[in-house]
């Protein structure tokens, strides 16, 4: 190895993120609850557009990757270069339905935002083999379907459609020459405080278990097939599932790096971040660090920290190995 190679600075990897509120670091409009007190009280000390008291999954992922914080699509979507990657995720986004003027573009629309930037010649040269693309999906389509009291018999077809759309979007990202393409598994929806409240936060609602299990089973098959196709065609692309389902369950069973007194109960209860006639429509705990969940759906900063401590070496290897 020549001296010039030894002196050459390491190429800093970039992170490109697509998804929903589990990944959004500030793309939603200022009238959403993520921009209202008490969101952001732990970090940065004020609302920042994150659906949390502080740092979220995207922030911890970039630390593991050794990347700088990605630009927000909301503020940098028209920039000529993406030297720090970009976060296209919007809180409230789903996989399937999104009207043309929706403030919450669905995940396919988000991926197409990047495609448009590439076609405009503003990104292509900025994507390198060390860069990572991530699709973060927390089941917005399923939660909406369940909350609308739609027939349970239709869930199987919905899951199949959602997972197939995830597959298509991963293929599109592969076509943009990403070598590392990650997707999250689906967290245990029935263990979210919005559903555990029915049991006074004592147990998960098992009625959602079947759809979560089916989603993750189909996703594993899709990712395995994509990796096999990549191997056969010698594309040197690696598709990877960030298994937050297992991490959620591990932490909630008190086997993670942080023990929470009641991991099914949220710190901010009620309509977090909302008020009426000057009065708060929520109650807030004294110490968010002692809670796994921040609100009815989203983990606290400490919750996300525990999740990423469980994810450990397999995730680090995928993100950092050439």
Curated annotation (Swiss-Prot):
Q: Could you tell me the EC number(s) of this protein?
A: 3.1.1.-
| GO BP | lipid catabolic process
Entry keyword Hydrolase: yes
Q: Check the record and name the InterPro entries matching this protein.
A: GDSL, SGNH_hydro_sf, SGNH_plant_lipase-like
Which UniProt keyword terms apply here?
Hydrolase, Lipid degradation, Lipid metabolism
Q: Which molecular function GO terms apply here?
A: hydrolase activity, acting on ester bonds
What the entry lists under CDD domains is as follows: SGNH_plant_lipase_like
A Pfam family the protein falls into: Lipase_GDSL
Question: What are the catalytic residues?
Answer: 21 (nucleophile), 295, 298
Family of the protein in this entry: Belongs to the 'GDSL' lipolytic enzyme family.
Q: What is this protein called?
A: GDSL esterase/lipase At5g03600
Species of origin reads Arabidopsis thaliana (Mouse-ear cress)
| Organism phylogeny | Eukaryota, Viridiplantae, Streptophyta, Embryophyta, Tracheophyta
